[in-house]
UniProtKB/Swiss-Prot annotation:
SUPFAM superfamilies the UniProt entry points to: Ribosomal proteins S24e, L23 and L15e
Cystine crosslinks: none
InterPro entries: Rbsml_eL15_core_dom_sf, Ribosomal_eL15, Ribosomal_eL15_arc, Ribosomal_uL23/eL15/eS24_sf
Region (Disordered): 155-196
Stated name of the protein: Large ribosomal subunit protein eL15
Pfam families for this protein: Ribosomal_L15e (PF00827)
Gene Ontology terms: cellular component: cytosolic large ribosomal subunit
């Protein structure tokens, strides 16, 4: 069976440092570091990933690149007396992932658009870069698209901010169902944040 062009792109991005992608990284990151936090781009860097997540080259859809700082929350160790068990240094799980932060920033930059999905495109020692697919729910070409018309409904307003994207649901523990997820539904907050 003949491999598609998208499969070759996907294979190259699996191990960027061992393929031609790694050679492009150095030049790209130098340019990206000079850019603002959120910037609109002409076309996706990873076309295979963008297409898999719902991107189409048509009116009403744009792609933006956003960068966010790397690492977890820097929490200093207490200098006052208490049990090390109660310092809260090891078992803290952050409420929002880096990817979700990037989606929210892009959503605020383009208030007339809704976040469809996002994917990783690069990182260095300080930042991670994500590309976010945004859709205009009021555009006629989106309303008439059988795959994207669902986003025109009012229930999807503010998807990124409410954690309804794929990255948002992952952070809220709602990618799984059944045994072990009892504290994740209807939400983590409803169970006093014991679900994560």
């Amino acid at each position: 069976m003949v491999k598609s062009a998208y499969s070759y792109i996907r294979d190259a991005w699996k191990n960027p440092s061992k393929t031609y992608v790694g050679e492009l990284f150095w030049e790209r990151l130098q340019e990206w570091r000079k850019e603002p936090t959120v910037v609109k781009i002409d076309r996706p860097t990873r076309l295979d990933r963008a297409r898999a997540l719902g991107y189409k080259a048509k009116q009403g859809i744009i792609v933006a690149r956003a960068h966010v700082r790397r690492g977890g929350r820097r929490k200093s160790r207490y200098s006052r007396g208490r049990k090390s068990k109660h310092m809260g240094l090891r078992t803290l799980t952050r409420r929002t992932s880096i990817q979700r932060m990037a989606e929210v920033r892009a959503s605020r930059k383009f208030p007339n658009m809704e976040v469809l999905n996002s994917y990783w495109v690069g990182q260095d020692g300080k930042h991670k870069w994500y590309e976010i697919i945004l859709v205009d729910p009021h555009h006629p070409s989106i309303a008439s698209d059988k795959n994207l018309s669902w986003i025109t409904k009012g229930t999807h307003r503010g998807r990124a901010e409410r954690g309804l994207t794929s990255a948002g649901k992952k952070g809220r523990g709602q990618r799984r169902k059944g045994k072990g997820t009892e504290k994740n539904y209807p939400s983590v907050q409803a169970h006093d944040r014991r679900g994560k």
